[in-house]
């Protein structure tokens, strides 16, 4: 069956809800503090990611849809960081600034793939005047195909009933990711998307699928909902609608590494698909496929159109092969969570020969996963001259990715991969030739993180330069 993705580029979605900033501090720890019996973390990497309703908006934008985000923030660096991060991924922010409150921020400190502590910076926004939120919704209703209300019980949706009524009056479907057990607040919504535990907290424990359907249909009637989608983890999803047979969809997840933010992905894909003009059943099909992709990633993540297309066509992304830098970071984090040793090397790899193959096979034997970082065409030209590369970057990466020894291939634009290596921090950095370890780009960063640096020998008689010279001589002859 041929599956066509929705026309996401024509979809407009507004997300209103509790926005927050997720901060991550990473670093090694090798000693206990003399001040208290706690580990000392030497922070060497800091990451900031939009969370809560902001992650829903990112999921919508990652599909190519037009995403607008409305929420409450403080007037602080966290709000500015959120705005910048979201603007970078084409989310249009229209925050209501509340000078008396901080932007909700969650700071996590991690070392050796373990979260040591989480610090929350927040004050509930209950009691804040909701009128500015209502005004922003009203202004957008004529230009959107769906309204998402993302509830994390932080106060932005204190007036959720008024928001539902505004959208329904304009004929715009309202999708809500609920929080808590008071579903009366969501009366009249188009679709609620509770997970199974949230659903059972309202209707009671369900022993069978039939009980889920029976109690779900009663909930729809009690709260005048148009539909209910219960996400059931490894058992997939169940869509319930009045007058229609239940639609049960099995999970499409190949491997589950992290369910963080999966609900955000589901409601984001649902909204974008509906706003593109597809049916609710089709929206659930695509949302289920997207959930299967995102739980295979570490941390709050989004799904690209290519990943979604692969998933719905039965070619779910394996998490290996040619990757972007951001995709690689997620793949490496997942590998470390599985206890795998990550090896990294780099080079031009212009005309792949036996020496390259032997070298990469030997490098792979030193760990569980091998990353190959490849010079871009411009970088290669600067290093090797105007006649190089012979093979363009895309072809070089595809050939490398086809080798059994290579797990991940990524490119870099600079003359050296030092910045890239500093961002990945492999357990083992490998380089071929007659280098000294301290001369290798990225060695200082790897050592500082507790990793190793090793020089491997190349096979004698194998050289790209010699191959090119031989080809040129043969042409002359």
Swiss-Prot record:
The active site is at residue 264. One of its GO terms (molecular function) is heptose 7-phosphate kinase activity. Keywords: Acetylation, ATP-binding, Carbohydrate metabolism, Kinase, Multifunctional enzyme, Nucleotide-binding, Nucleotidyltransferase, Transferase. Its EC number is 2.7.1.167, 2.7.7.70. GO terms for biological process: ADP-L-glycero-beta-D-manno-heptose biosynthetic process. SUPFAM superfamilies: Nucleotidylyl transferase, Ribokinase-like. Homodimer. In the N-terminal section; belongs to the carbohydrate kinase PfkB family. In the C-terminal section; belongs to the cytidylyltransferase family. This is Bifunctional protein HldE. It comes from Shigella flexneri serotype 5b (strain 8401). The gene is hldE.
């Amino acid at each position: 069956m041929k599956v066509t993705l929705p026309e996401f580029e024509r979809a407009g979605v507004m997300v209103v809800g509790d926005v927050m900033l997720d901060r991550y501090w990473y670093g090694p720890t090798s000693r206990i503090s003399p001040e208290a019996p706690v580990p000392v973390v030497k922070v060497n990497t800091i990451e900031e990611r939009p969370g809560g309703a902001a992650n829903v908006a990112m999921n919508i934008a990652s599909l190519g849809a037009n995403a607008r985000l409305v929420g409450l923030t403080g007037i602080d660096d966290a709000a500015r960081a959120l705005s910048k991060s979201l603007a970078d991924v084409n989310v249009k922010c229209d925050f209501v600034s509340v000078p008396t409150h901080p932007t909700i921020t969650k700071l996590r400190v991690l070392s050796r793939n373990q979260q040591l502590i989480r610090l929350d910076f927040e004050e509930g926004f209950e009691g804040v005047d909701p009128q500015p939120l209502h005004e922003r919704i009203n202004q957008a209703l004529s230009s959107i195909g769906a309204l998402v209300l993302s509830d994390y019980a932080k106060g932005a949706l204190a007036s959720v009933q008024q928001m539902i009524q505004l959208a329904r009056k304009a004929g715009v479907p309202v999708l809500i990711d609920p929080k808590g057990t008071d579903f009366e607040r969501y009366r009249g919504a188009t679709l609620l998307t509770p997970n199974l535990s949230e659903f059972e907290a309202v209707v009671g424990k369900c022993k069978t699928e039939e009980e889920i359907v029976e109690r779900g249909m009663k909930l729809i009637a009690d709260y005048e909902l148009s539909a209910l989608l219960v996400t059931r983890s490894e058992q997939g999803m169940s869509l319930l609608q009045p007058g229609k047979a239940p639609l049960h969809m099995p999970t499409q997840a190949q491997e589950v590494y992290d369910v963080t933010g999966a609900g955000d992905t589901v409601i984001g894909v649902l909204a974008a698909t509906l706003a593109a003009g597809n049916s609710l059943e089709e929206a659930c099909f695509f949302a289920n496929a997207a959930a299967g992709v995102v739980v295979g990633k570490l941390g709050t993540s989004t799904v690209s159109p290519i990943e979604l297309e692969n998933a719905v066509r039965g070619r779910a992304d394996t998490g290996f092969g040619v990757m972007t830098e951001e995709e690689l970071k997620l793949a490496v984090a997942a590998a470390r969570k599985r206890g795998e040793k990550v090896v990294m090397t780099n080079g031009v790899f212009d005309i792949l020969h036996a020496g390259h193959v032997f070298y990469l096979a030997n490098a792979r034997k030193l760990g569980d996963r091998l990353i190959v970082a490849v010079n871009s065409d411009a970088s290669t030209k600067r290093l090797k001259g105007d006649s190089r590369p012979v093979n363009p970057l895309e072809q070089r990466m595809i050939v490398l990715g086809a080798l059994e020894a290579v797990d991940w291939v990524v490119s870099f634009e600079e003359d050296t991969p030092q910045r890239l290596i500093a961002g990945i921090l492999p357990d083992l950095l490998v380089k071929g030739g007659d280098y000294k370890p301290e001369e290798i780009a990225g060695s200082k960063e790897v050592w500082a993180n507790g990793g190793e640096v090793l020089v491997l020998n190349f096979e004698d008689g194998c050289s790209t330069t010699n191959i090119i010279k031989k080809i040129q001589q043969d042409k002359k002859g």
